[in-house]
Amino acid sequence: MAEIAPLRVQLIAKTEFSAPPDVEWSTDADGGAALVEFAGRACYQSWSKPNPRTATNATYVRHIIDVGHFSVLEHASVSFYITGLSRSCTHELIRHRHFSYSQLSQRYVPENDAEVVAPPGIEDDPELLALFTAATDASRAAYTELLNRLEAKLADQGTSTLRRKQARQAARAVLPNATETRIVVTGNYRAWRHFIAMRASEHADVEIRRLAIECLRRLVAVAPQVFSDFEITALADGTEVATSPLATEV
């Protein structure tokens, strides 16, 4: 029986910042948030912080976001390694074209023992979950049989690596959308804010909304000055959403 894969979002990379020594400026932040402020001040050469209302990094970045000067957010980035995500969810995720992706290849990686992701509404209902599991098990059994027969059919063609790829790329057609995938996603701060605004909404599919919320929690830990304006709240059904009073791109 297929195992249910839990969603996991792991931070694997983030921006570091080194201020040029010939610029007389200091900040109370580091990393990506400091880079955002530096880029913004570089536009106006406001190194002396003439406006006391934007003298700290947090107030400066908040002002940048509030007035919609989003381009300076593009200099800093974060990378996540995401597992426990369904193939159907990544079909939605990769529509965000400002992200960079590296995803598990079903041509190179056999899916005989792949885990699955149970959709919301099914995962907490024993009868529906049993039906779901039976369907995914049947798909995986068909995949395994197709794979074995295709490998036998192609036994005298090309190299062993080529034969495996050809067999897997054909057999994968019967795998369900619920098949777990694994993906590295890199995006700049502007792209992440857009993703959160779009996908942490109550109008988004619940699986990708969960992903957006988990990413947001880790983004707040990395750069609270840039992401803490988003507030996470629970809906009546127990799922979570995130909204911001500041300017966002949708």
From Swiss-Prot:
Family of the protein in this entry: Belongs to the thymidylate synthase ThyX family.
Residues that hold FAD according to the record: S71, R95, H96, R97, Q103, N188, Y189, R190, H194
Domain ThyX: 7-233
BP terms from Gene Ontology: dTMP biosynthetic process; dTTP biosynthetic process; methylation
Pathway: Pyrimidine metabolism; dTTP biosynthesis
Gene name for this UniProt entry: thyX
PROSITE patterns: THYX
Free-text comment on the cofactor: Binds 4 FAD per tetramer. Each FAD binding site is formed by three monomers.
Subunit structure as annotated in this protein's UniProt entry: Homotetramer.
Cofactor(s) listed: FAD
Motif ThyX motif, residue numbers: 95-105
Free-text function comment from the UniProt entry: Catalyzes the reductive methylation of 2'-deoxyuridine-5'-monophosphate (dUMP) to 2'-deoxythymidine-5'-monophosphate (dTMP) while utilizing 5,10-methylenetetrahydrofolate (mTHF) as the methyl donor, and NADPH and FADH(2) as the reductant.
Domain of life, source organism: Bacteria
Binding site for dUMP: E92, L93, I94, R95, Q103, L104, S105, Q106, R107, R172, R199
Protein name in the entry: Flavin-dependent thymidylate synthase
